[in-house]
Regions:
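Short, charged/polar N-terminal "headpieces" of proteins
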Residues: 1-26
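Generic structural motif
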Residues: 9, 21, 30, 41, ...
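Acidic, aromatic-enriched beta-alpha/helix-loop junctions
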Residues: 31-73
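Acidic, low-complexity intrinsically disordered segments
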Residues: 55-97
Length: 97
């Protein structure tokens, strides 16, 4: 498992490489919730997936074979950018975790 650093800003993009896979994440505000776009090696995995707590962002096993992401929050609060790095974090876990 690996924690992915997030900035407490409403819209952000980040790119990380894990186990020879390049992940591009876009996290943005959509009304009163956060949504995520996920690409792996330039291929779309998920678009505008709602960010929830303690549930994988990639809900389908066949799309998550190279790993998955989950928001960890206090008291099961929905992910919100103002809490990133304080009470909320994003973690990646690979197939061997």
């Amino acid at each position: 498992m690996r924690e992915i650093p997030l900035n407490p800003v409403p819209n952000q993009r980040l790119q990380i490489t894990i186990d020879d896979n390049r992940w591009d994440l876009t996290i943005k505000v959509a009304r009163n919730m956060m949504v995520c776009d996920i690409r792996r090696n330039d291929e779309v995995v998920m678009l505008a997936i709602r960010a929830t707590t303690d549930a994988p962002l990639i809900p389908y096993n066949h799309l998550a074979s190279a790993g998955n992401f989950v928001f960890i929050t206090e008291r099961d609060a929905l992910p919100w950018y103002e809490e990133f790095g304080k009470t909320q974090s994003l973690v990646f876990w690979g197939p061997d975790d």
